[in-house]
């Protein structure tokens, strides 16, 4: 691949601590948007030519915004039994708000059987950026109440209150 064995440690370059909330939201969305067209890779967290899965794309976008949701990491993300989407949904330092109050930069989650299985970034105007398990590349889509076998959670996660 031309990448060192440490490619699993790849992290997007974050904004400085002095960045405003608006700058952070736009950095998060901008990072995800710049990955559109990147291939789907299960357990992938970039860079672009190596691909992403849904939570890897969101995790790198959070890093780009200057957020580091420890103990969730790109290393753990690659573990076969680690569920990054579920961990992001349950992360105690992110705010949960009703779906009807969603804002640009919020995270929209889907779950099946009580387990979160998919995550996307809300862009506004009922649009999201994500990649999915169906092998399609990172892209922009309309939000839907269900996604495959999973249903949207009644709340969204606001990583940048």
Task: Describe these PLM feature segments.
Residues 45, 133, 161:
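Residues that form or immediately flank small-molecule/cofactor binding pockets and catalytic motifs
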Residues 24-91:
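Secreted/periplasmic proteins that engage bacterial cell-wall peptidoglycan
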Residues 43, 109-111, 157:
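Residue-level detector of conserved, well-ordered beta-strand and adjacent loop positions
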Residues 20-24, 46-54, 97-100, 111-112, ...:
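Extracytoplasmic/periplasmic, Sec-exported soluble proteins
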Residues 14-18, 43-44, 91, 106:
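Residues at structural and domain junctions
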Residues 1-39, 100, 149-161:
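Intrinsically disordered, low-complexity
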Residues 67-144:
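...with weaker cross-activation on analogous glycine-rich loops/strands in unrelated enzymes
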């Amino acid at each position: 691949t031309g990448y060192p064995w440490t490619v699993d440690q790849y992290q997007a370059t974050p904004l400085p601590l002095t960045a405003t909330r608006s700058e952070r939201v736009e950095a998060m969305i901008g990072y995800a948007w710049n990955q559109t067209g990147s291939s789907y890779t299960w357990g992938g967290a970039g860079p672009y030519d190596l691909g992403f899965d849904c939570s890897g794309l969101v995790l790198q976008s959070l890093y780009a915004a200057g957020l580091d949701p420890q103990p969730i990491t790109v290393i753990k993300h690659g573990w076969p039994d680690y569920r990054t989407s579920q961990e992001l949904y349950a992360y105690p330092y992110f705010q949960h708000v009703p779906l009807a109050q969603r804002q640009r930069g919020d995270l929209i989650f889907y779950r099946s059987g009580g387990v979160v299985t998919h995550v996307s970034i809300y862009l506004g105007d009922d649009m999201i950026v994500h990649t999915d398990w169906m092998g399609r590349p990172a892209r922009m889509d309309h939000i839907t109440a269900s996604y495959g076998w999973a249903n949207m959670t009644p709340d969204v996660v606001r990583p940048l209150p």
